[in-house]
Swiss-Prot record:
Keywords: Cell cycle, Cell division, Chromatin regulator, Chromosome, Cytoplasm, DNA damage, DNA repair, Metal-binding, Mitosis, Nucleus, Phosphoprotein, Telomere, Transferase, Ubl conjugation, Ubl conjugation pathway, Zinc, Zinc-finger. This is E3 ubiquitin-protein ligase RNF8. It comes from Bos taurus (Bovine). A zinc finger (RING-type) spans 405-443. Residues 38-92 form the FHA domain. The FHA domain specifically recognizes and binds ATM-phosphorylated MDC1 and phosphorylated HERC2. This domain is also required for proper recruitment to DNA damage sites after UV irradiation, ionizing radiation, or treatment with an alkylating agent. It is found in: Nucleus; Cytoplasm; Midbody; Chromosome, Telomere. Pfam families: FHA (PF00498), zf-C3HC4 (PF00097).
Amino acid sequence: MGDPGSLVTEGRAGERSWCLRRVGMNTEWLLLEDGNEVTVGRGFGVTYQLVSKICPLMISRNHCILKQNAEGQWTIKDNKSLNGVWLNRERLEPLKVYSIHKGDHIQLGVPLENKENAEYEYEVTEEDWERIYPCLSPKSDQMMEKNKGLRTKRKFSLDELEGSGAEGPSNLKSKISKLSCEPGQQVKSHGKGKVASQPSEYLDPKLTSFEPSVKTTGAHVNPGPAKVIELLRKKKKASNPSASQSSLELFKVTMSRILMLKTQMQEKQVAVLNVKKQTKKGSSKKIVKMEQELQDLQSQLCAEQAQQQARVEQLEKTIQEEQQHLEGLEKEEGEEDLKQQLAQALQEYRSLVEELNRSKKNFEAIIQAKDKELEQTKEEKEKVQAQKEEVLSHMNDVLENELQCIICSEYFVEAVTLNCAHSFCSYCINEWMKRKVECPICRKDIKSKTRSLVLDNCISKMVDNLNSEVKERRIVLIRERKGKRLF
C-alpha cells in the first residue's frame, strides 16, 4: 500500500485551497477548509491548538474564529482574547467580524518587550493543494486520534533492548520518545551524529512545549506579554497585589523546577544513548535501570507540567479579575470626565443660545425695516398707478370731446380740416359733400380741405395707450373705409 499522505494529495490534486501561511516558516500552516469553521487557541476542542513556547499566556484558550460568510468570503473574529488579534497591524475589536483577503497579515498576540515580531504571524494565501499539504499543521483531533494507543507507558524487555542494539541509535530514539507522559508530537528521525552536540533532538517535542520563562537560577523572569505586565503594574497602584504576586512567585518556582527536570532528563537520555552506543549486550541491566530513572524523571516532569498548567490558568483568571477591576476604575474616571465634558458642552450650548437670540433680534429689526420700506414702495406704486389711470381717463375725455368726428362719432380717421377750421374724417366729409357742399357745423361753403398728419399721429399714439377693445375697433373701422374707397 502507498503512503496515506500521497493518497490524500492525489485525491485533491489540482485543487486550490485557502490557508494561513506561517510567516518565515514552511511548516505549521493552518488550512481553511470550505464550509468549516476554524478555531485557533491553546485549549482543547479547537481546530488548531497553539502552545506558545515563549509565554504560555500569549494565546488564549479559544483565541479567534475563522469562517466563511454567506458570500463565501473568509472572515476572522477575535473571541475576546487577552492579547488580541491584529489584522494588517491594526487590532480587531472583540466579537466583531472582519473580512480577510489574499495577502492580509494576521498576528495572534503581541511581541515581547525584547522582540520586534510576535511569535504567531500568518499571511492569508491561496495555493495549490500539492504546495499546501506538506506544510500543514496537524489538527487537534488528528493528533489525539493518532496518539490514542500511546497513552500507556511501556517498558522495554531485555530482548527488545538487545535487539535495539543492532538497530542503532535512531530506533532507540523513537522508543525513548514513546515513554513521554503526553506523546502528542512525532519525533523526527535524525541520522547518525554526535549525541552530545544535539541532545534536545531526542526529546519528546511535547516536553519542550513549555519553554522556561526564567533563567536557570530562577531569579529573573523573561518579560511576558506587554498587556499582562502593564495590568499587574496598574493593579499594584490601584489595590493589594498579593494575589498576582503569589501567582507569579509560584510560576517562577515551578518553571525553575521544570527546567531542572528537563535538564536532568536530557542528561539521562544522552547517557542512555551513549551506553547503548558503546555496548550491545553487556550492560542491559544498566540500560534498563537508566531508562527506569528516565521514566521517573518524565513522570515528575508531567506532574510539574500539570501543576504549572493549573497555576497558569489561575494566573490568567487573576489577571482577568484585575483587568475587570481596572476597567471599573477607568469607567469611574471616564464618568467624571464625561460629567466635566457635559458641563462644558452645556455652557457652550447656553452661550450659543444667547448668541442665536441676539442674532434673531437683529434679523427681526432688519426684517421690520425691509417690511416698512416695502410698504412705502407699495404706496408710491399705488399713487403712480392712480395718477396714470387719471391721465388715461382725462385723455379719453379729450379724445371724446375734441378728437371725435361729429358725423361718425369715431376718432378721426385720416383727419382733414376745412377752410372754416372744422375737422372731420376724410371719408365722412367726402360722403357728406355728395349731398351738401357746406360745413356740417357752421354751414359755410366748403372751399378747401387740408389733410392734418399731425392730428392723425397724435390720435394714433393716444389710442395705443387705451384698452385693446378700442384698438381693435379702430383697426376694423380703418379696413372697412379702405375697402369702401376701392369700390
